[in-house]
Amino acid sequence: MDGKKCSVWMFLPLVFTVFTSAGLWIVYFIAVEDDKIFPLNSAERKPGVKHAPYISIAGDEPPASCVFSQVMNMAAFLALVVAVLRFIQLKPKVLNPWLNISGLVALCLASFGMTLLGNFQLTNDEEIHNVGTSLTFGFGTLTCWIQAALTLKVNIKNEGRKVGIPRVILSASITLCVVLYFILMAQGIHMYAARVQWGLVMCFLSYFGTFAVEFRHYRYEIVCSEYQENFLSFSESLSEASEYQTDQV
């Protein structure tokens, strides 16, 4: 891959993945240090530690909760930006837009879920927190499958299979983790459920990092134009737009 020909937008999903991963692990280590949770590699519980190392429990009390809220808010914002850019990227390349629109809506709902679970801690409002968790995991999983299908279908720069197959594998891994997580939770096997949850989140973040492969081919621009007093007619506007169609913003 020639770095000189790569768009700077490829770094957006990478920043999302690295920043969110680092932030969540900081929350984890703060909670372990404060004896709020016991470590993921513990064979048994430490004396005085009451909780399994779920992400929500790790970020439930200050100071970890402050970091957790900030990380989830920033992650939700970056995920929303990725969702919009991905939608714009694929819009001129898909004949039936419903799948692309579904991917945008699903990721927007997952982003909204991130803000709920990040700002409504488990002990403060468990119901809203769980709604946020369901939105994030549920629509996040749906997003992964939709984007995997779009990757194989659109085949940008003939890299559809190279990127699509790893996304299918990650989507299957995420789906398996979600199923295992709820099964283990229902059976009260909290240590293994917490480990699966961390694996699930890392798979999600790895998936988002793969968007860098396709974003490196695209340049996005924000165009600012001065307000004109003399309006063009609607037909003239359409005519100009049809003459200058690109897949850039």
From Swiss-Prot:
It catalyses: Ca(2+)(in) = Ca(2+)(out); Na(+)(in) = Na(+)(out); K(+)(in) = K(+)(out); Mg(2+)(in) = Mg(2+)(out). It comes from Bos taurus (Bovine). This is Transmembrane protein 150C. Residues 31-64, 119-130, 190-192 are extracellular. The keyword Membrane applies. Keywords: Cell membrane, Lysosome, Membrane, Transmembrane, Transmembrane helix. Belongs to the DRAM/TMEM150 family. It is found in: Cell membrane; Lysosome membrane. Tentonin comes from the Greek 'tentono' meaning to stretch. It is a multi-pass membrane protein. GO terms for cellular component: lysosomal membrane; plasma membrane. Residues 1-9, 86-97, 152-168, 214-249 are cytoplasmic. GO terms for biological process: cellular response to mechanical stimulus; proprioception. GO terms for molecular function: mechanosensitive monoatomic cation channel activity. The chain crosses the membrane at residues 10-30, 65-85, 98-118, 131-151, 169-189, 193-213. Nonselective cationic channel with high permeability to Ca(2+). Component of a mechanosensitive cation channel. Confers mechanically activated (MA) currents with slow inactivation kinetics. May contribute to proprioception. The gene is TMEM150C.
